[in-house]
Amino acid sequence: MPSKVYFTRNIAPESVLKLYEACGLELSGNVAVKLHSGEKGNQNFLSPEFWRPMIEHVHGTVVECNTAYPGSRNTTAAHWQTMRDHGWSDAFTVDIMDEEAPDLQLLIPNGKVIQKNCVGKHLTESGSPSSCAQYRHVRHICSLHRSGHHS
């Protein structure tokens, strides 16, 4: 069953909470909130203060993984520095999920192109993974996507 994705054109912390309520779900356990923390020198991310009401509402932990491309988040040390520079680690509990090797390998049954996916092994500590993403298309649009439980 495909996931539902909710959008809003009103870019405000209150709108994010309304999107969460529209999902009709209560996240439980250790709630992992995946978002874009921003690259060094780039202002194209929504600040910790923007996300504060949502993250506090679900008692969440901000989670990310190191990037596979050059930048300020491609090593754990650089990623932690970026999290500090952008205020994330001061505002919330943060978990860089692939900080410790090896990655967790998830099998994809009947995968046509990919048969396994490597993810940060801290994913197993999350009772409710969720993703908060921002998109640009004509205007800035914000979405909240509930990814569901993993096995």
Describe the residue ranges of each PLM region.
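N-terminal and secondary-structure boundary signal
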Residues: 1-151
